[in-house]
Amino acid sequence: MTDLPVDKILDTLGLRCPEPVMLTRKTIRHMQQGEILFILADDPATTRDIPSFCEFMDHQLLKSKTDTPPYEYWIKKGI
């Protein structure tokens, strides 16, 4: 992890597309604007899907670690 403060952690290890993004959407829907979600994943599809999800839904991908699994993502909820 990093020194970024997180408000919620989502562990999607072992899940495959489309489950990680579906759970991300469901989780972030119940968060407040500006809160940070940390996601842990091992599905290679998340390296494409999570950034696309953030762009499409107007959330901010603060940081990602995708060089080797498990992949890590820090998302700041937008509007």
Curated annotation (Swiss-Prot):
Residue positions of the active site: 17 (cysteine persulfide intermediate)
Protein name: Sulfur carrier protein TusA
PANTHER family, A to Z: SULFUR CARRIER PROTEIN TUSA, SULFUR CARRIER PROTEIN YEDF-RELATED
Classification via SUPFAM superfamilies: SirA-like (SSF64307)
Organism: Haemophilus ducreyi (strain 35000HP / ATCC 700724)
Subcellular compartments: Cytoplasm
GO molecular function, one term: sulfur carrier activity
Alphabetized UniProt keyword annotations: Cytoplasm
Entry keyword Cytoplasm: yes
